[in-house]
């Protein structure tokens, strides 16, 4: 963080609890060997205590989340089909590939089934390892088959315990990052406590276990911790190389386990670019990190059989553009303030233009359309034009992709996290502006630099990185609620670091003329301890009540549907329906699907729009022809979609389909002038009347309070 450059005399009686220091005072060491020995012993003791607490708090968090999951579902007591149904939507799809690998006679056949899969999308053979990020399921299935644990641990428990184990690593990485920034493990303890007490806003692992982000975010946290250490000045060559290795491995694993990796790392690249441009980060270290990002993505691209979406990512185009712009624009960091500011703006414009140019060229060469729905969504979200695009509106109408709800800040304030975060953020932003202005003013004036060395605050590179990181990811979370988990966890780290930072308190006490070394020590330890006591007092009873509250999984209609499919349909039958439900059909029954929730493919999106015409105003023969074009044998209709009330008018699935088809929406309210009344009634409603035009094409074979299954005729 901010360090006063002017050194003061260090007294032998002062004992530091800091993390391994960046510099050693050789003169003091020669004069006071006994003092230095005691200092080293204290540091070893501090490291031991801090490390032990880090491991314990990580394991306790893991056990806590696993217990919540068990208590909420009574997972150990319910049937296998109920366990599988509890993996909702895309979670069930991912878990099905773990199950598929375990059921394969051999590993080779299991791999072959994933590479040449013809059950995930009917009438198509796709490479699942290319299309999806499921190497983690492959790795776990291999481990389960190889390790001698089959007699003691069911496959589903091996899977979920691995995910909860990763949560232990996640919390430990957050703890270490805060410790590295502040110099005391007390900061890490506070970060971990905040993470747990704000669980609703920091993680959703206990009810979305197989979700890709639950695999990826622990590695992302490790990467941030490693980058924080790497950006420290004066690292030993061996330490630097080992840290680079840790950054590379964690970046690679993060990229391998989540399809949105490229967008998160693009944010990181923007952080590096900002700091490098403002001379707040060594350019050499920024170059290393750019290179690691590109290398990791290219390795993942190879493992995913040259997935074109990775090659066409904005991250690769941006990082290459930064390298090219550096070569084209020399002496970027010299000259007066206005001179440097002009060069910086030109540099920014050049990088932006090169990024867009390279990205468009790559996408045209590869004929890449897989990510176009994301850009359509962003364009509509930020008001750059209204759209009737079904895919974009599907995202816009989901709460998870909306703005961060205001009540989030109320919950974060209850734990004092938000107040502490704003306090620390305000101070560091002011210091960052001062440092950036000084760096741009006159980098060639040695007198100016000398003056700064003697009396001006400075921003450490690792602190500057985490500051810009938290700001950019904060904007991301504010704009898209689903991404809040990337911000709130780092918020815990940044707030706890600031409260335990000696530089923060030194700056604050000096500004109110109360500076005293003892006061700094008192403030940096007493404030976090008081907050920890407050958190224990206020939230411990609630956490104990939460752990004692027992519920049970209950979804009899879905269980009945899955059992009926298993008992009454051929194993090669093809099912159509909603993406979310079909993921469960794939997992519980192994039947072939027409569509599924992994939405990162343009042809799948077109197929899904066609299948969803079952909820639109279409003629029975049109719907039948569309479904049969995908080889559909059975279609599942859900009352919860056909008569949906959860979303407002204009955001119900049937409304999105009506708008995309140019039809007027149901119910009172305005319609766009060019929308016209449909020629046919809504299919999902009319088919239940068993009228001749519908009976000729569809025969009802199953029905309960939630689902209606129809068998398609083949002779039409």
UniProtKB/Swiss-Prot annotation:
Its UniProt entry gives the catalysed reaction(s) as: L-tryptophyl-[protein] + a di-trans,poly-cis-dolichyl beta-D-mannosyl phosphate = C-alpha-D-mannosyl-L-tryptophyl-[protein] + a di-trans,poly-cis-dolichyl phosphate + H(+)
Membrane topology (Cytoplasmic): 1-43, 183-184, 198-215, 231-239, 280-289, 324-338, 438-465, 500-522
Pfam families linked: Dpy19 (PF10034)
Glycan-carrying positions = 118, 704
Q: Write down the EC number.
A: 2.4.1.-
Q: Which residues lie on this side of the membrane: Lumenal?
A: 65-154, 257-262, 307-308, 360-414, 486-487, 540-716
User: Which pathway features in its UniProt record?
Assistant: Protein modification; protein glycosylation
**What is the membrane topology here?**
Multi-pass membrane protein
The domain of life for this entry's organism is: Eukaryota
List the intramembrane segments: 185-197, 216-230
Q: What's an example GO BP annotation here?
A: protein glycosylation
What residue intervals traverse the membrane?
A: 44-64, 155-182, 240-256, 263-279, 290-306, 309-323, 339-359, 415-437, 466-485, 488-499, 523-539
Record InterPro entries: Dpy-19/Dpy-19-like, Dpy19L3
Location in the cell reads: Endoplasmic reticulum membrane
Matches recorded under CDD domains: Dpy19L3 (cd20181)
Q: Which GO terms describe its molecular function?
A: mannosyltransferase activity
Query: A Gene Ontology CC term for this entry?
Result: endoplasmic reticulum membrane
Q: So which tissues is this one expressed in? A: Widely expressed.
This protein's domain notes: The C-terminal luminal region is essential for C-mannosyltransferase activity.
Family, according to the entry, reads as follows: Belongs to the dpy-19 family.
Described function: C-mannosyltransferase that mediates C-mannosylation of tryptophan residues on target proteins. The reaction occurs on the luminal side of the endoplasmic reticulum and involves the transfer of a mannose unit from a dolichylphosphate mannose (Dol-P-Man) donor to an acceptor protein containing a WxxW or WxxC consensus sequence. C-mannosylates RSPO1, a Wnt signaling regulator, preferentially at the first Trp residue in the sequence WxxW. C-mannosylates the netrin receptor UNC5A, preferentially at the third tryptophan of WxxWxxWxxC sequence.
Q: What is this protein called?
A: Protein C-mannosyl-transferase DPY19L3
Q: Which organism is it from?
A: Homo sapiens (Human)
């Amino acid at each position: 963080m901010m360090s006063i450059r002017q050194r003061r005399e260090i007294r032998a009686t002062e004992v530091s609890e800091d993390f391994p220091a960046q510099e050693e005072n050789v003169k003091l060491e020669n004069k006071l060997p006994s003092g230095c020995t005691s200092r080293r012993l204290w540091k070893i003791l501090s490291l031991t205590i801090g490390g032990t607490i880090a491991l314990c708090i990580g394991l306790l968090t893991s056990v806590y989340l696993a217990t919540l999951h068990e208590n909420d579902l009574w997972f150990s007591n319910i049937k296998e089909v109920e366990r599988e149904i509890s993996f909702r939507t895309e979670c069930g799809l991912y878990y099905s590939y773990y199950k598929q690998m375990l059921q394969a006679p051999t590993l080779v056949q299991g791999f072959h089934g994933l590479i040449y899969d013809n059950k995930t999308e009917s009438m198509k053979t796709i490479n699942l390892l290319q299309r999806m990020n499921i190497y983690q399921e492959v790795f776990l299935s291999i481990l389960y088959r190889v390790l001698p644990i089959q007699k003691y641990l069911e496959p589903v428990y091996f899977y979920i315990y691995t995910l909860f184990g990763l949560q232990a690593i996640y919390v430990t990485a957050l703890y270490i990052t805060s410790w590295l920034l502040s110099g005391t493990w007390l900061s890490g303890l506070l970060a971990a406590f905040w993470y747990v007490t704000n669980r609703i806003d920091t993680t959703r692992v206990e009810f979305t276990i197989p979700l890709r982000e639950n695999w990826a975010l622990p590695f992302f946290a490790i990467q941030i911790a490693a980058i924080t250490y790497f950006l420290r000045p004066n690292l030993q060559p061996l330490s630097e190389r080992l840290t680079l290795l840790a950054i590379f491995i964690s970046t690679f694993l993060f990229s391998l386990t989540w399809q949105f990796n490229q967008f998160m790392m693009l944010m990181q690249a923007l952080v590096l670019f900002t700091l490098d441009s403002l001379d707040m980060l060594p350019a050499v270290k920024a170059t290393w990190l750019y290179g690691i990002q590109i290398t990791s993505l290219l390795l993942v691209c190879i493992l995913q059989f040259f997935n074109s979406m990775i090659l066409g990512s904005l991250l690769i185009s941006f990082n290459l553009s930064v390298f090219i712009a550096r070569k084209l624009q020399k002496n970027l960091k010299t000259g007066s303030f206005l001179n440097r500011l002009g060069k910086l703006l030109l540099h920014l414009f050049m990088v932006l233009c090169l990024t867009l140019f390279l990205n468009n060229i790559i996408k045209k060469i590869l004929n890449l359309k897989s990510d176009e729905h994301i850009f359509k969504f962003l364009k509509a979200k930020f008001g750059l034009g209204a759209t009737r695009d079904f895919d974009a509106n599907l995202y816009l109408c989901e709460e998870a992709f909306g703005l961060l709800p205001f009540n989030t800040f109320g919950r974060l304030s209850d734990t004092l996290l938000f107040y502490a975060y704003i306090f620390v953020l305000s101070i560091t932003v002011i210091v960052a502006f001062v440092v950036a202005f000084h760096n741009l003013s006159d980098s060639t004036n040695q007198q100016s630099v000398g003056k700064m060395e003697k009396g001006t605050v400075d921003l450490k590179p690792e602190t500057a990185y985490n500051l810009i990181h938290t700001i950019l990811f904060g904007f991301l979370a504010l704009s898209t609620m689903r991404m809040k988990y990337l911000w709130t966890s780092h918020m815990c780290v940044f707030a706890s670091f600031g409260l335990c930072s000696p530089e923060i308190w030194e700056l604050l006490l000096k500004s109110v003329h109360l500076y005293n070394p003892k006061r700094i020590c008192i403030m940096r330890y007493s404030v976090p301890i008081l907050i920890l006591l407050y958190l224990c007092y206020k939230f411990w009873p609630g956490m104990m009540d939460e752990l004692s509250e027992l519920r049970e999984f209950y979804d009899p209609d879905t269980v009945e549907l899955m059992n009926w499919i298993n008992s009454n349909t051929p194993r090669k039958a093809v099912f159509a329906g909603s993406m979310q439900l079909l993921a469960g059909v794939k997992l519980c029954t192994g039947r072939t699907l027409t569509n599924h929730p992994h939405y990162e493919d343009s042809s799948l999106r077109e197929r899904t729009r066609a299948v969803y015409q079952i909820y639109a105003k279409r003629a029975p023969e049109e719907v039948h022809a569309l479904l049969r074009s995908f080889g559909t044998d059975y279609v599942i209709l859900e009352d919860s979609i056909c008569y949906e009330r959860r979303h407002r008018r204009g955001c119900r699935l049937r409304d999105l389909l009506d708008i995309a088809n140019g039809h007027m929406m149901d119910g009172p309210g305005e319609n766009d002038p060019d929308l016209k009344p449909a020629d046919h009634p809504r299919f999902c409603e009319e088919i239940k009347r068993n009228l001749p035009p519908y009976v000729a094409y569809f025969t009802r074979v199953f029905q309960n309070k939630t689902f209606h299954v129809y068998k398609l005729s083949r002779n039409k």
